[in-house]
């Protein structure tokens, strides 16, 4: 996905492949005592609900339709979201939420048992009646049980949601729809997902000052593939190809190219710029997430890899041309009818954490395919995905 589900990496843990096997076997055994008792019915008018998704940016944005659905269903309840520091800025302005609970390091790379116990205590202090768990990790799914939350609804991937009172099967569908399945599992009506992000007024004002440029305004995000506890360079399209498309936007469309990226992405942006004949507006490393959202909101198009910024563009109403490699856009693609995902993969690709450079198909996407998609989206003639 844009930012993949970061599985927990406990300090001193075993190798991923061996651990996955052991976790799968252990979860199937652990779920037996949880299935002895019939779970209580979900409350008709809950007073306090928690959504639990520590990481990462794309996943959190894909959960915003669920946030809106819960608020529509229960206008007067207290609705909180437990999230890590990496993704917290994407929820700070969400009008449907009453509060945010910090997850610390849990679910965002390596963490200790003391980190885990501290989060259990924070969740217990919230006195929640129900928790919606959007993470596939059994340790994350176990948190609301340990915190004494009676109703636990969430994703059950391979039996890993053994502690949930309402386990929801993980089917082959878009991640945003999968999250909404958790609401439907307890009888909540949902609408077609629409991602949401709300820049602050001062962030929009800064974007206005920065982008007094010629249209079309095309944002290019050439980096990505980096999250807490994970680095996947196989998700990056070559910088020289971004450079060719960027020059065509400037020369053929008389537009403006805006390079975007976070701290640490400067080298990738520099690799694009040094291969260009024209000068882009380089904002790499200069913007907060909120300011990035405000800039994307003013752009006519965002071209980039499978990243959190891709989902952020959709959340502010900007169409996307997204280039995919090892991840599957049918699950993690831009969820917007105006957007296009370019992908040469297949279902035979291995799971993300086992992808090797020779497995990825991102370089199979050509400059001409990307350029054609850019023109098609800008002229509003795109088709939904692929």
Feature locations, PLM:
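Catalytic machinery of carbohydrate-active enzymes
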Residues: 1-386
């Amino acid at each position: 996905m844009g930012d993949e589900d970061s599985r927990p990496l406990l300090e001193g843990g075993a190798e991923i492949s061996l651990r996955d096997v052991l976790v799968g076997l252990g979860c199937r055994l652990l779920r037996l005592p949880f299935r002895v008792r019939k779970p209580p019915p979900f409350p008709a008018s809950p007073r306090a609900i928690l959504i639990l998704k520590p990481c990462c940016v794309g996943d959190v944005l894909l959960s915003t339709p669920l946030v809106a659905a819960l608020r529509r269903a229960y206008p007067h309840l207290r609705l909180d979201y437990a999230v890590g520091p990496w993704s917290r800025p994407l929820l700070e302005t969400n009008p449907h939420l009453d509060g945010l609970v910090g997850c610390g390091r849990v679910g965002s790379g390596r963490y200790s048992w003391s980190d885990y116990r501290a989060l259990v205590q924070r969740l217990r202090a919230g006195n929640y009646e129900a928790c919606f768990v959007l993470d596939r990790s059994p340790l994350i799914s176990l948190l609301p049980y340990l915190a004494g939350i009676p109703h636990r609804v969430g994703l059950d991937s391979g039996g890993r949601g053994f502690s949930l009172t309402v386990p929801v099967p993980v089917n082959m569908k878009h991640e945003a729809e999968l999250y909404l399945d958790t609401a439907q599992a307890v009888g909540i009506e949902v609408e077609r997902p629409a991602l949401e992000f709300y820049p602050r007024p001062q962030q929009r004002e800064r974007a206005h000052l920065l982008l007094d440029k010629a249209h079309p305004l095309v944002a290019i995000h050439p980096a990505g593939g980096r999250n807490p506890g994970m680095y996947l360079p196989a998700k990056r399209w070559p910088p020289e190809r971004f450079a060719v498309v960027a020059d065509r936007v400037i020369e053929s469309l008389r537009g403006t190219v805006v390079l975007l990226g976070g701290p640490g992405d400067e080298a990738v942006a520099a690799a694009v710029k040094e291969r260009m004949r024209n000068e882009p507006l380089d904002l790499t490393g200069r913007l907060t997430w909120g300011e990035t959202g405000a800039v994307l909101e003013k752009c006519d198009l965002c071209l980039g890899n499978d990243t959190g910024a891709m989902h952020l563009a959709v959340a502010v109403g900007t169409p996307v041309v997204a280039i995919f490699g090892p991840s599957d856009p049918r699950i993690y693609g831009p969820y917007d009818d105006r957007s296009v995902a370019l992908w040469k993969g297949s279902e035979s690709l291995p799971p993300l954490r086992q992808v090797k450079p020779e497995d990825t198909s991102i370089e199979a996407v050509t400059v001409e395919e990307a350029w054609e998609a850019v023109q098609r989206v800008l002229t509003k003639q795109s088709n939904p995905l692929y």
